[in-house]
């Protein structure tokens, strides 16, 4: 009975989350854009339709999204790095529901990383201190109805995620595809009570490509479904900014020599935000960090 009660509670929380997300994206564009914060690379608040594009592409993805970020205590050494979460005054439950989902998925992500650590021959708790107060992001995404034939853009072009791992709840609408080892695209459909877990580029880099990044895309629906929205809520699990992403020694050998230069997760994130079009290269990594400190 307790497990049934817990399952029912999870269903309610998931429905409540998607309800709040729909409510937000249904707000007038002018209202949503009032929550678009300049100068922080889209790390908190609203990011408008077509702003983000995949690495190596110029066409903006056919989506708009929101970012919930880390909730740190004031005495955390990372507190000054993170912009504050943006409060939506029109929706009194939106931020609380988002925070609860963020913290539940973060907790789940820690357990996934522990399992991966054991698989990699590391201490089970290797990732724990890097994940605590990490720069993780919960991103509710809205792919609006398609109103005309897109020239080259799709809902989300093929890409790998930046972070360590991504936890993705069953989306409201199909379209997610992942690329298998043969280079073929296959549909990735999670049920409402399941999670899709992707390996991100940071973990791929840290393991010297022993764990390969999950390349995925969100394709446009068939014409008869153009009038439908798609909603998705990925949780991007990032480490703290000073985590070294140097290739692990036990992932380097004669058959798999070191493939990546040493870099911290913060520096790597900056490079990728430039690639995505979320910040301009004229904004240096140190300037961005200074702005984040000021924003807090």
Could you tell me what each predicted segment is?
Residues 266-289:
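C-terminal helix/juxtamembrane-tail motif
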Residues 37-43, 71-74, 97-177, 219-225:
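Conserved double-stranded beta-helix
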Residues 1-2, 8-15, 286-293:
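Conserved small/polar residues in nucleotide/adenosyl-binding loops
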Residues 21-32, 70, 105, 109-113, ...:
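A generic secondary-structure signal for well-formed alpha-helical elements
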Residues 57-60, 132, 160, 190, ...:
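Extracellular/periplasmic catalytic domains that process cell-envelope and extracellular macromolecules
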Residues 6-7, 127, 153, 168-263:
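Catalytic core of Fe(II)/2-oxoglutarate
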Residues 49, 63-71, 141-143, 170, ...:
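Structured loops at beta-to-helix junctions and adjacent beta-edge loops in soluble globular domains
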Residues 6-103:
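Non-heme Fe(II)-dependent double-stranded beta-helix
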């Amino acid at each position: 009975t307790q497990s049934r009660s817990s399952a029912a509670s999870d269903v309610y929380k998931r429905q409540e989350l998607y309800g709040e997300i729909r409510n937000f994206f249904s707000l007038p564009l002018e209202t949503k854009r009032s929550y678009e914060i300049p100068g922080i690379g889209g790390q908190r608040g609203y990011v408008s339709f077509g702003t983000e594009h995949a690495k190596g592409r110029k066409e903006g993805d056919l989506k708009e999204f929101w970012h919930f970020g880390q909730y740190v205590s004031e005495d955390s050494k990372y507190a000054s790095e993170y912009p504050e979460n943006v409060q939506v005054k029109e929706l009194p439950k939106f931020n609380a529901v988002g925070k609860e989902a963020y913290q539940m998925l973060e907790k789940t992500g820690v357990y996934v990383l522990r399992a991966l650590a054991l698989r990699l021959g590391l201490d089970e708790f290797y990732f724990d201190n890097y994940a605590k107060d990490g720069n993780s992001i919960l991103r509710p995404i809205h792919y609006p109805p398609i109103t005309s034939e897109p020239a080259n853009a799709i809902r989300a072009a093929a890409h790998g995620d930046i972070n360590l791992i991504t936890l993705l709840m069953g989306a409201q609408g199909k379209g997610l595809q992942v690329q298998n080892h043969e280079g073929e695209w296959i549909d990735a459909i999670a049920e409402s009570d399941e999670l899709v877990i992707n390996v991100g580029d940071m973990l791929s880099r840290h393991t010297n490509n022993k764990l390969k990044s999950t390349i995925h895309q969100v394709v446009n629906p068939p014409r008869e479904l153009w009038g439908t929205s798609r909603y998705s809520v990925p949780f991007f699990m990032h480490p703290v900014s000073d985590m070294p992403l140097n290739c692990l020694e036990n992932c380097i050998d004669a058959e798999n020599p070191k493939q990546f230069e040493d870099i911290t997760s913060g520096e790597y994130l900056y490079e990728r935000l430039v690639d995505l079009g979320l910040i301009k290269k004229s904004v240096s990594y140190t300037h961005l960090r200074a702005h984040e400190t000021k924003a807090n």
